[in-house]
Amino acid sequence: IRDVLAGIREHLDLSEIDAVLTGYMGDETLGDIILQTLTDIKRANPEALYICDPVMGDIGRGIFVREGLPPFFANKATPAADIMTPNQFELGLLTGKDVLTYDDAIAACRQIHDKGPRIILVTSLLTDGTNNDEISMLASSHESEHYVVTTPRLSFNPEPNGSGDLTTALFAGHLLHGRDLKAALNATSQTIVKVFEETKHIQELTGSRELAIIQAQDYFRGDKSSSLS
């Protein structure tokens, strides 16, 4: 990864980088290399954003990364990040607290905001008050803005990979294009629902576990309506 980043430096002025988005990492050593590079990018462009998807685990699966990564995300990546996009399980890991209710989630977000990130998107949230056929996303800002959107929860067998990556990328893209927190959340959730619906349809026909991002690409471009019913 050092060689890849060195190659990028040779062909790109770091001041032209508007954002750095990270997801799954193999180990904390890779994370340290990324944060070192991030320091150089922010020195060249102080307005550049670091969007961190702290991939560590999920409800029902537990932790599925190496043992050094949870403390890396909690103690190093969180203070460096401008935007974080944990799922409910990861939100609990980052704060050391159970997240079972909406109030728990708000309190956990506040705890993370206090470490540095000004925007948090909880990419999946199932609280005690959530119906089994629904799932929520929560967007929070350090200015105490909180928005929740609840959408249908589709069942998959097997579960497709990459939904968190897609959600983070969409949300970051909307923010970088000037949408406010509420608008970015709504636009992200609308597209995710359409991708999941298309994925569900294809899985029923073929058994594929791949997200249908190609088949649903018109919703990314805005060529089709993606309004929630």
Describe each region flagged by the PLM.
Residues G26, M56-D58, E90, L125-D128, ...:
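Glycine-rich beta-alpha junction loops
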Residues K182-S229:
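Charged C-terminal helix
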Residues E145-Y147, H174-T188:
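Phosphate-handling active-site elements
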Residues L5, R9-L12, L38, K42-N45, ...:
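Structural signal for hydrophobic packing residues in well-ordered secondary-structure cores
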Residues V65-Y147, F156:
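Conserved phosphate/ATP/ADP-binding segment of small-molecule kinases
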Residues I1-I59, I63-F64, R209-L228:
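Conserved N-terminal subdomain of the carbohydrate kinase-like
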Residues G92-L93, P158-L181:
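Short, small-residue alpha-helix embedded
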